[in-house]
Amino acid sequence: MDIVSLAWASLMVVFTFSLSLVVWGRSGL
């Protein structure tokens, strides 16, 4: 695994986590 794919994987994880966090925050859970 090279650094580019690793960076993309970490970016997708952070984006998905922050997006789900915003959705949970707006849902009031």
Curated annotation (Swiss-Prot):
GO molecular function, one term: electron transporter, transferring electrons within cytochrome b6/f complex of photosystem II activity
Membrane topology: Single-pass membrane protein
Keywords linked to the UniProt accession: Chloroplast, Electron transport, Membrane, Photosynthesis, Plastid, Thylakoid, Transmembrane, Transmembrane helix, Transport
Domain of life: Eukaryota
Transmembrane regions listed in the UniProt entry: 3-23
Localization in the cell: Plastid, Chloroplast thylakoid membrane
UniProt-recorded name of the protein: Cytochrome b6-f complex subunit 8
Record note on quaternary structure: The 4 large subunits of the cytochrome b6-f complex are cytochrome b6, subunit IV (17 kDa polypeptide, PetD), cytochrome f and the Rieske protein, while the 4 small subunits are PetG, PetL, PetM and PetN. The complex functions as a dimer.
Function: Component of the cytochrome b6-f complex, which mediates electron transfer between photosystem II (PSII) and photosystem I (PSI), cyclic electron flow around PSI, and state transitions.
Native source organism of the sequence: Coffea arabica
Chief localization: plastid
HAMAP family per UniProt: Cytb6_f_PetN
Gene Ontology terms: biological process: cytochrome complex assembly; photosynthesis
